[in-house]
Amino acid sequence: MMSKADFFKYTTEYISGVMSLRKPQAESLKILDKIISSVNLAKNIDLSSNLSIVNSLYPICTNFEREFMSLTFALATGVGKTRLMGAFIAYLYTQHNIRNFFVVAPGTTVYEKLKQDLGNPANPKYVFKGLGCFSSTPYIIADDDYRDKSINLALNDINIFVFNIDKFNKEESKMRDINEYLGQSFYEELAALDDLVLIMDESHHYRAKRGWSALNDLHPLLGLELTATPYVKNGAKQVNFKNVVYEYPLSAAIADGYTRTPMALTRKDIDFY
């Protein structure tokens, strides 16, 4: 097993090399490192001081938009957001001793994929391949594990909670019930962690009032939002995210060869339809 004394080598450059990160992924990791190295990363702090620091570094970010420091990385579809999640986790674990991550998926398909990509070394797309810091596979907590298992988070090197936002919203009241194994509710257990990082895949799905409130109540140390569409619709109006720190649009992804140019297929002879 790798000694934690060896974690010093897990710089952003080292992680980017081992994980073969693409340019926008590597840049996102560097930005996270710069921000974390500049702010006071702690729970229950004055968000305005951290916002001032982040805004000075990345003026596009004008508001964290949540009750905790939350940063959006707006990357075009096809660039590889799941691998970037893995890079974020590896960096925060090795460089800042963060051991608890709560990953939110926008639907069942992505949720099932994330469980495999983050927790199954036999999966061809397992994101932590080659990283010695994860010689022991991260402990995945998903589905109804919070009810059925005697969860002792302190026993694991790293815990990754994976939840589908729909199930999370539906199960929220049950998660707030007292858990006989924990001695408190699962929600209280999570909220009490001083190192919980919330990672939101396709985060534009989590800005509805219900999901917004439920995630705020987890009181995470940090939020990391990944989306290709950093805005929400309010009627006919488009409301852009205010907490974006990095944008890599579709035009850049096409120019760099990471995704194909979208094409609309048409048909000339359609009289018989």
Regions found by a protein language model. Give the residues of each.
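Conserved pre-motif I regulatory segment
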Residues: M2-A74
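Conserved helicase ATPase motor motifs in RecA-like P-loop NTPase domains
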Residues: F73-V79, E202-Y206, D217-K237
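Motif I (Walker A/P-loop) of helicase-class P-loop NTPases
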Residues: K81-Y91
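Conserved Walker A/P-loop ATP-binding site and its immediately adjacent core
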Residues: N97-G132
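Short glycine-/polar-rich loops that comprise or flank the Walker A/P-loop
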Residues: N97-R99, I158, D194-D195, H219-L222, ...
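Conserved nucleotide-binding/hydrolysis micro-motifs of P-loop NTPases
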Residues: T108-Y111, D166-K170, H204-H205, T229-K233, ...
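Conserved RecA-like ASCE ATPase "motif II neighborhood" in helicase/translocase motors
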Residues: A142-L153, I158-A214
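Conserved interdomain linker/interface between the two RecA-like ATPase lobes of SF2 helicase motors
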Residues: Q238, K242-Y273
